């Protein structure tokens, strides 16, 4: 039963990974920015670094591309500004955990 559960979790992770690849490749904003720049992105924004000015410039992690996650920050003056950083979304973290667990079990 445990082997079946691990295999099903691995299949779900692989499907999630492949669908994430397809979605990332087809994002309209990213395609427009690539056409505007007319150059491949060799420099990307690492995990935990600010991506406020380039929301589609995050690097790839082990399995997935990091996503630019934004939050509203209120300064002491009461001014609201948006701050963004590259990070791993929770569902990607869960998929990486399942894959890591599978690697430990099956070597």
Curated annotation (Swiss-Prot):
Which stretches of the sequence are propeptide?
21-41
Show the InterPro entries listed in the entry. Answer: Spider_toxin_CSTX_knottin (IPR019553), Spider_toxin_CSTX_Knottin_CS (IPR011142)
Gene Ontology CC: extracellular region
Q: Which family does it belong to?
A: Belongs to the neurotoxin 19 (CSTX) family. 04 (U1-Lctx) subfamily.
Name of the protein: U1-lycotoxin-Ls1u
Q: Which keywords does the record carry?
A: Disulfide bond, Knottin, Secreted, Signal, Toxin
Q: Does the keyword Signal apply?
A: yes
**UniProt domain comment:** The presence of a 'disulfide through disulfide knot' structurally defines this protein as a knottin.
Leader sequence residues: 1-20
The species this protein belongs to is Lycosa singoriensis (Wolf spider)
| Top-level lineage group | Eukaryota
Query: Pfam families from the xrefs?
Result: Toxin_35
Answer whether the UniProt record assigns the keyword Disulfide bond to this protein: yes
Main localization (coarse): secreted
Q: Which residues cross the membrane?
A: none
Which cysteines link up through disulfide bonds?
44-59, 51-68, 58-86, 70-84
* Tissue-wise expression: Expressed by the venom gland.
Q: Where, subcellularly, is it found?
A: Secreted
PROSITE patterns in UniProt: SPIDER_CSTX (PS60029)
Q: Which GO terms describe its molecular function?
A: toxin activity
